Curated annotation (Swiss-Prot):
Record-linked Gene3D superfamilies: Aldolase class I
Organism: Shigella dysenteriae serotype 1 (strain Sd197)
Database matches in InterPro entries: Aldolase_TIM, Class_II_FBP_aldolase, FBA_II, TagBP_ald_KbaY/GatY, TagBP_aldolase_GatY
Catalytic residues as annotated in Swiss-Prot or TrEMBL: 82 (proton donor)
Quaternary structure and partners: Forms a complex with GatZ.
Name the UniProt record assigns to this protein: D-tagatose-1,6-bisphosphate aldolase subunit GatY
Pfam family, one: F_bP_aldolase
Pathway of action: Carbohydrate metabolism; D-tagatose 6-phosphate degradation; D-glyceraldehyde 3-phosphate and glycerone phosphate from D-tagatose 6-phosphate: step 2/2
Binding site for dihydroxyacetone phosphate: 181, 209-211, 230-233
Cofactor binding, per record: Binds 1 zinc ion per subunit.
Binding site for Zn(2+): 83, 180, 208
GO MF annotation list: tagatose-bisphosphate aldolase activity; zinc ion binding
Catalytic activity: D-tagatofuranose 1,6-bisphosphate = D-glyceraldehyde 3-phosphate + dihydroxyacetone phosphate
Function: Catalytic subunit of the tagatose-1,6-bisphosphate aldolase GatYZ, which catalyzes the reversible aldol condensation of dihydroxyacetone phosphate (DHAP or glycerone-phosphate) with glyceraldehyde 3-phosphate (G3P) to produce tagatose 1,6-bisphosphate (TBP). Requires GatZ subunit for full activity and stability. Is involved in the catabolism of galactitol.
Amino acid sequence: MYVVSTKQMLNNAQRGGYAVPAFNIHNLETMQVVVETAANLHAPVIIAGTPGTFTHAGIENLLALVSAMAKQYHHLLAIHLDHHTKFDDIAQKVRSGVRSVMIDASHLPFAQNISRVKEVVDFCHRFDVSVEAELGQLGGQEDDVQVNEADALYTNPVQAREFAEATGIDSLAVAIGTAHGMYASAPALDFSRLENIRQWVNLPLVLHGASGLSTKDIQQTIKLGICKINVATELKNSFSQALKNYLTEHPEATDPRDYLQSAKSAMRDVVSKVIADCGCEGRA
C-alpha cells in the first residue's frame, strides 16, 4: 500500500532533523509535478487539498489518482485534508480512504477549539488516521477563509501543551508570524516563540504560510522543531504566470498538452527548491 498517513512521515522528520513539504495541488498537472519531482529526488511529500480542491476534483478521483501515481513510482504518498472545518465532511472523506486530516477550529475560543478537535481525533484514530490541528491563527486567505492581519493570533506556548494533551492530536500547526498568500515584504518570524513552543510540546510542529519564505528562515524553523512545511500560493503563482506568458507568446496555441508544459516546468522548479530547503531529498 503506497498511500499512507502522515504520522510516520512526520515522526521520521522529527527524528531526522528535516521537514516534509505539504504541497497543495489543484488538478492532474499540479499533482504530476509534485509526485514526479518527489520520486526523482527520493523525497517524502504530502499531497494536500483544501475543501475547495476536493469539491473541484472529487474525493474518489483524487484518491484514485494519488494511489495510481504512488504505485507507478513506487513512492509512498500521503493525501491530506488541509484546513477542513466540518466534522461530517472530514468523516465522509476518511471513510472514502483519506488517512491524514487537518481539522481547523483555530477561529473558535480555546475551549471550543479543543472540543471540536477532540471530536475529530476520537473519530479519526479509530481508522488510524493522523490528525493535525492549529492553535493561533494565521492572517491571509486560504480557500474561502479570510483572516485580517489584525485578527491573526500567535500560538501561546503554555496553551499549546494543554491543547496537545487535551485533544490527542498527532501534529500541531503553530502561528509564529507567517500568513497565507505571498508576502509584500519579508515577514518577521518569532523564532523565540517557536523555540519556546518546542520546549512545551514534543509533537511534530507544522508551519503554514511558507510560500515566499527565504531558505534561511525555513531552515531555521526546522532547526527549532518544524517538521512539516505547507506551500500553496507559490505553486499556483508559478504555474499560472508561466501559463499566461506562454499563451501571450503563442496566441495560436490550442493544445493543453503543449501549453501546460511550461507551467509544469515553472512549478517543478518551486517544488524542487522547497524539497531542498526542507532537507528531505533522499529521505523517502
